[in-house]
Amino acid sequence: GILVFLALYPAIDSITVWAQAPLTVPAVRPLVPTAVATADSLFFSMEPLASFRRLEARVDIAPNDYEARWRAARAALVLGVIEEDRERTDRWLRIAVQHASEALALQPDNVDAIAWLAAAKGRLATDIAGVREQVRLGQEVWALTQEALAIDRNHAFANSIFGKLN
């Protein structure tokens, strides 16, 4: 296993050896402050799945991390949009709704949280939902965008979502 590898191929420095060992939750805790920044870097490097996985690991360690939650919603939403298989699209979009809902529960007046939840529900309505669920989700998206725009009438993302409703 890993001990044989380390014994046969000694590392030049201790950092390399540490990186070769399996990471555990206690080992990852010191790296947590960089988790969101790393996830953003992965996301903007067109790697939404790697970003989502990093954020999911962060949420497992710190479920009340608002920043990780909304970013996980964003990554899952993009994964749902680019997925070609209908079942996997449905799963990703519902994961996006869940993370966005959790983010909103953590910061109920945060316009970004409201907008990401509206976007996730809106995409679910247009891509997956049946007629009844489309109507319900459409009403929820309308209410969420109204709530977001009441907080910040110039919020670009909320206005974009609202524009798609009309």
Please describe what each predicted stretch is.
Residues P30-E56, A72-D109, A115-N154, I161-N166:
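Short coil/linker segments at helix-helix boundaries
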Residues F5-E67:
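Extreme N-terminal leader/anchor segments
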